């Protein structure tokens, strides 16, 4: 079944219909020789094993084979999860430990995703864009090329309440730390959003906005460009 991940109602339908998952990992001491594992993955030999599987199946397995088990320790990090984490191995970007990136996210070449960043389903991150520490990009948020999203900043998602219009951050925009871009807002190319601002309406290209709610305070000039320089070396 296919889904349109640019539509909030389609994303919601996907979350409703997809099979939910509660994966677990088990460190087990015992003798599992000849034991039927079903769909459980098992690695090890002699008297030590590591098992991977769904919670219900693993629980049944442990109960049915308790006479063969000396001890075990179970780890679990989610419950009835609908959307897995994005597979990162083939992405040409720098993604630091601790970033949380859901599946169905697009990340452009040479982007940088820092520790603690959270990126939800359907988001798009452009080439050479940096998402700094603890920044949040909600469902379907779109960041262009060479954007800097400051630490703790939020680009609101448009999944609930549903909206046809996502947040759009155009190329070469700098968003300061802890700024908030509300649902459906568009930030024009080359603009700067001051730290701590709350942006409630569209921002044209080439301006600086600040405050709560954010207002235009000036046009981007050479002094502004010097203070908001993007460093290519961080994106190599």
From Swiss-Prot:
The reaction(s) this protein catalyses: (S)-2,3,4,5-tetrahydrodipicolinate + acetyl-CoA + H2O = L-2-acetamido-6-oxoheptanedioate + CoA
Gene3D superfamilies assigned to the protein according to its UniProt record, in alphabetical order: Hexapeptide repeat proteins, Malonyl-CoA ACP transacylase, ACP-binding
E.C. number(s) listed in UniProt: 2.3.1.89
Pfam family, one: Hexapep_2
Enzyme class name: transferase
GO molecular function annotation: tetrahydrodipicolinate N-acetyltransferase activity
Keywords of the record: Acyltransferase, Amino-acid biosynthesis, Diaminopimelate biosynthesis, Lysine biosynthesis, Repeat, Transferase
Pathway(s) of this molecule: Amino-acid biosynthesis; L-lysine biosynthesis via DAP pathway; LL-2,6-diaminopimelate from (S)-tetrahydrodipicolinate (acetylase route): step 1/3
GO biological process, one term: diaminopimelate biosynthetic process
PROSITE patterns documented for this protein: HEXAPEP_TRANSFERASES
Entry-linked InterPro entries: DapH (IPR019873), DapH_N (IPR013710), Hexapep (IPR001451), Hexapep_transf_CS (IPR018357), Trans_hexapeptide_repeat (IPR050179), Trimer_LpxA-like_sf (IPR011004)
HAMAP family hit by this protein: DapH (MF_01691)
Role noted for this protein: Catalyzes the transfer of an acetyl group from acetyl-CoA to tetrahydrodipicolinate.
Family, similarity comment: Belongs to the transferase hexapeptide repeat family. DapH subfamily.
Protein name: 2,3,4,5-tetrahydropyridine-2,6-dicarboxylate N-acetyltransferase
Source organism of this protein record: Clostridium perfringens (strain SM101 / Type A)
Annotated gene: dapH
């Amino acid at each position: 079944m296919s889904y349109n991940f640019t539509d909030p109602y389609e994303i919601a339908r996907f979350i409703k219909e997809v099979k939910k998952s509660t994966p677990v990992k088990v460190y087990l001491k015992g003798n599992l020789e000849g034991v039927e594992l079903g769909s459980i993955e098992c690695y090890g030999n002699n008297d030590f094993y590591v098992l991977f599987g769904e919670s219900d199946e693993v629980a049944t397995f442990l109960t049915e084979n308790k006479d063969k088990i000396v001890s075990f320790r179970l780890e679990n990090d989610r419950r009835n999860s609908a959307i897995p984490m994005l597979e990162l191995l083939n992405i040409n970007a720098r993604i630091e430990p601790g970033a949380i990136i859901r599946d169905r996210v697009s990340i452009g070449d040479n982007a940088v995703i820092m520790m603690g960043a959270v990126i939800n389903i359907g988001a798009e991150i452009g080439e050479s864009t940096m998402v700094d520490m603890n920044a949040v990009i909600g469902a379907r948020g779109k960041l262009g090329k060479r954007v800097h999203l400051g630490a703790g900043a939020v680009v609101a998602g448009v999944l609930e309440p549903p909206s046809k219009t996502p947040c759009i951050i155009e190329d070469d925009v700098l968003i300061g730390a802890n700024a908030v871009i509300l649902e459906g807002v568009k930030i024009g190319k080359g603009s700067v959003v001051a730290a701590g601002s709350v942006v409630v309406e569209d921002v044209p290209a080439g301006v600086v906005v600040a405050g709560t709610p954010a207002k235009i305070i000036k046009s981007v000039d050479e002094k502004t460009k010097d203070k908001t320089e993007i460093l290519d070396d961080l994106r190599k």
